Amino acid sequence: MKRFLLIVLTLATLVSLFGCNTSEENSIPNNSIEVSEEESMAELIVPPFTKEEIAAHKELPIWPEGNVPYTMDETVPTVVPYLVENAKGCIMVLPGGGYFQRTDKEEGSMVAEEYNKQGYSAFVVHYRYKPYSGDAILADANRAIQYVRYYSDAFGIDDDKIAVIGFSAGGHLAVMTCQHDSDYKIDDAISKESSFPNACMLLYAVTTLGDGTFMGAGNSSMPEIFLGENKDNKNLIDKYSYYNDINAMPDTFIAYTNKDTFVDFEKNSIALADALEDAGKKVVIKEYTDGTHGLGIGAVYADYSKWFGESITFLGESFK
């Protein structure tokens, strides 16, 4: 990203640069010259973290202290960095958990570490969940992307190569970041960055809050948590379902197992893929035949575990 710095060149500087005569008739007045540069002239941004904190995967608060939206307690939304040198791109990891918990290991740190091995930096997003509802959850996810974009130079990533990956309920949140900017705004430089990802990857994802989303042992409380007292409001159900703004979706990778007994893959994964294809959007969809739900990397499953390598292929094509 290019940032601009106003450089004021004094008379003495110009004389030095151009060897000008300093007599009154040949003097050059002071001028303000706007210069665009990538690095040496970039606006000085002092990040609120150190290299040591990054290396230690310290949680980085994404909201200013005392200005966390929709707050009800002392919960501090954060991102956890997993960085590599010369990153091919950046993955924002949204763990699942039905919005009543967050599976930060199996669908968070373990996923980030695997992408590191393939040359991608990653951030695990510690968004809020129950008792918080969708306003806070989406605000955290949007802000996390903006935060990483704003400090992209310090993180050593390309701010045009940021993908979001979501598992189960985290998949729903991933889709929402592609279609919605948070209604909550604060007046700071970070909030001026785009909150939309450049690519989207979904694993056994919930993509709609409508009827039939869940099956068997599925967590039917998820719409109630996300929408709160408005859980039966059809307008809001539609707003926070994949079909709300299908044309806003970036390149999308969808993977699921046909043994899933929690989330109805036909009404979520397949329905989203069909809508993307109908809209002429790029979509890659993969169906696997083993495992059930909540698998994360799922290395022990011969078929399902192929998703990770296929996601790397997808990223390589999307981040050309």
Show where each model-derived region lies:
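Primarily recognizes the serine-hydrolase "nucleophile elbow" in alpha/beta-hydrolase
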Residues: 143-216, 237
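Mobile cap/lid helix-loop segments that gate and shape the active-site cleft of serine hydrolases
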Residues: 65, 205, 209-244
